[in-house]
Each structure stands twice: as structure tokens, then as C-alpha cells.
Amino acid sequence: MNATILVKIITPLSIALEKQAKIVTMSGEEGMFGVLPSHVPMIVSLKAGLVQVYIDDMHKSENTYLISGGVTEVTANYINIATETAINVTNLSEAEIATKLLDLQKTLSDQH
């Protein structure tokens, strides 16, 4: 399967990521889900967590972002993820990502 889907992670200040991908996974309010090219259109509320962008079929994430929650719009050709905060954690260890997630969750709870 050579088809790809355009994924954008958009914050109020910038486009954090704009890339063609084979698979994108993220955390919705109902749990983790993945999106492949030609997916049925949908709009999903997202929880704070990881967005993983897979560039090839080997299931190794090329780009990983920690987001503060938000909403995603999915069509057959693109995925738009709108979020307040997107942190590129691609090159961090699992422990470093866990620490950043805890920090982000604390920041979000302090805002409410």
C-alpha cells in the first residue's frame, strides 16, 4: 500500500507538523485510534497524549508529538489536529515523555 494521508498538527501559534503519513495514531475521548489513507470522514475530540505519525509500513513512528488535547478532523485525504499545545517528543526517551506528559497534565489542571 503506497497511499499516504496529509497530517497537520495546528496550534494557535504555528503549524507544528505538516507531513504525508501512512498511519497516524492518537488518543480520543473513547480511547486510542488509528487513521489510514481513505478513512471515513469524522470529527473526534482528543485527550492529552501522544500523536504518532508513521511514514512507512514498518510501524516505527517517524514523528511523535505530545498534545494537550483538542479536536481532529479526518477525511479520506487529510487529518487536521487542532490543539493548544504540541511538543515534539520524537527523540526523547519514554521516561522523558512521561515526565513531559505529567507536566502538561499539571499545567492543564492548573488552568481549570
Swiss-Prot record:
Q: Which UniProt keywords apply?
A: ATP synthesis, Cell inner membrane, Cell membrane, CF(1), Hydrogen ion transport, Ion transport, Membrane, Transport
Q: Name one GO molecular function term.
A: ATP binding
> How does the UniProt record describe the way this protein sits in the membrane?
Peripheral membrane protein
> What's a Pfam family this protein contains?
ATP-synt_DE_N
A single Gene Ontology CC annotation of this entry is: plasma membrane
Q: Which domain of life is it from?
A: Bacteria
Kindly list the places in or outside the cell where this protein is found, as annotated in its UniProt entry.
Cell inner membrane
Gene3D superfamilies in UniProt = F0F1 ATP synthase delta/epsilon subunit, N-terminal (2.60.15.10)
**Where is this chain primarily localised?**
membrane
Keyword Transcription regulation in record:
no
The record's function comment reads:
Produces ATP from ADP in the presence of a proton gradient across the membrane.
> What family does the database annotate?
Belongs to the ATPase epsilon chain family.
How it assembles, according to the record, is: F-type ATPases have 2 components, CF(1) - the catalytic core - and CF(0) - the membrane proton channel. CF(1) has five subunits: alpha(3), beta(3), gamma(1), delta(1), epsilon(1). CF(0) has three main subunits: a, b and c.
Please report the name of this protein according to its UniProt entry: ATP synthase epsilon chain
Q: Which organism is it from?
A: Rickettsia rickettsii (strain Sheila Smith)
Gene for this chain: atpC
